[in-house]
Amino acid sequence: GQVLAPVGLDALIGSPGGVFTAPLEAAETVKSRAAVVIGEAQKQYHPLREPELSARRNADSVPKHSWDDMKFTFEVNDTLPARIWQHIITNGSLGAIAADIGPAGLWYKNAREMPLIAPPGDIYDAGSPERLYVMHGGKPVSLFAANDGFACRVSYIPGCAEWEKEIGKNKIRTRLFIPQGLDARVLLIDGADRLPLIWELEPALGGKNGACLRIEEEPGLIRLSSPDSYYPGVQMLIGSSAELDAETGFIPAGLRIKLNTGAETVLCCGCCTETELRELCTPDTARSLLSAVSARWARLLGTFSLRCGDSALEHYMNGWAVYQTVACRLEGRSSIYQSGGALGFRDQLQDSINLLLINRGYARERILDCCRHQYAEGDVLHWWHPHPDGDRGVRTRCSDDLLWLVWALCEYVEATGEEELCFIEEPYLSSPPLKDEEHDRYERPEKSAKSAAVLEHARAALECCIHRGFGKHGLPYTGSGDWNDALDRVGGESVWLGWFFAYCATRFAELLERLGADGADEVLEHFRVLRVVKLHL
């Protein structure tokens, strides 16, 4: 006011587009974000990021690799594979991507909506938003595969990733895992005794590049929070068995932590409680929890075995196919290739039914959850993001997704004999039906007051297909999708959908007869498409 009033500009004080004053205690915060500070000498800021640690990617490179039971190992010396070789690690709540170049992404509950550390930009990247290195001969040397002249052996094991690297006289082994029941990722480092260690990461915490990030440092702990968080109130904690010496940078939002390593060093980050994190940072606890993770996967993957004479196929089928289905498709729903985060109506139903020989619980939960994501009209959310305030997803005119509920229910009952599932009540969703001009709609639907047994949810899906109509050849319309999203706007009739529709109708009629429920004859009578499809095959 003392400056503006004498020149007749006092009306600008506190007015829209005018001049505002901030409390003195806000000065440092304002300066830290300002592009220019008038009246002060220009300071020189140095980015936190050290010179590139990553190796080159060669389009023709296929690393030497081998199998040892469930352990897949490959060796990198200067040249990385053409694309990132990755490994998904998750406990169903917290998830991480391990890559040849080291940790390559971390998320809480939803990989797309709640990344804690974003993954690399694409599958050809040779760098990551998280780096871990030691200084050797005055130069940074990554603990992972990199262009530094040191060979690195990378091993992927169910629930764990391992990097082994000899740097000078130190044979360093770094293991990454996520304990069951704890929302924290652990890096357990052996052999880096007395080497100064630098840990750099660019937290996102649900926002874009950590644009709005609050960082607080306490003894032995760093706390991060963001108003942009997909899950309000969730904080990210960082801790270690070693003393933390942290500094921050703004563009991109970065964190550099210096540590002095011991014979074993534990680095932890995640969304667990402070008490849990501090306990997890002790080497004995970390090793014990890693053993529990290994035991969990051994129990699950050991229930199926294939012998076919093809060693490569046997290695894949005897554990890895199941692991990737559970960890990547069902629990993690992410990879560098596609970090979706959402649950799909048809995708996870197919994945979980394929696990019936392993664990029926996955399929049972998917069937019930899909019933909860069906509208009273019979159509469904094609995919959705779970959220405590109500799931958000896309309502479409997709022509096949709803039928996978019918297929999954019939497969489940036939394989398990658990008929009781058919009579569990689940609510529908409620929202205005799509308008004629709407191709699809992203929304947060309400939970309907109407509910029905799982059997009736399946019946509603079949009836919805009938109501959508048939073309002049007696075949159902393609709609949008038809199990091929590239056909969203093609239109016409679909032989494939007619076949699948007829198959589901037959199976459902058999299920009704098995249960002694009404409607089996009507189902078969109503689906004239059964006869039409035979004419086209």
Regions found by a protein language model. Name each.
Residues G1-R346, G361, R366-D369, E411-A415:
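Anionic coordination/interaction segments
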Residues S352-G471, V495-G498, A502:
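Aromatic-rich carbohydrate-recognition surfaces in CAZymes
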Residues D347-D351, V490-E493, G519-L524:
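Alpha-helical scaffold segments that form or flank carboxylate-/histidine-based iron centers
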Residues S155, L301-A342, E365-H387, V454-V490, ...:
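Extended glycan-interaction surfaces of carbohydrate-active proteins
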Residues L313, A363, C398, A458, ...:
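Hydrophobic packing residues in well-ordered alpha-helices of helical domains and bundles
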Residues L381-H382, F500-L537:
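Catalytic cores of carbohydrate-active enzymes
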Residues L343, R489-F500, H526:
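Short, contiguous, pocket-lining structural segments
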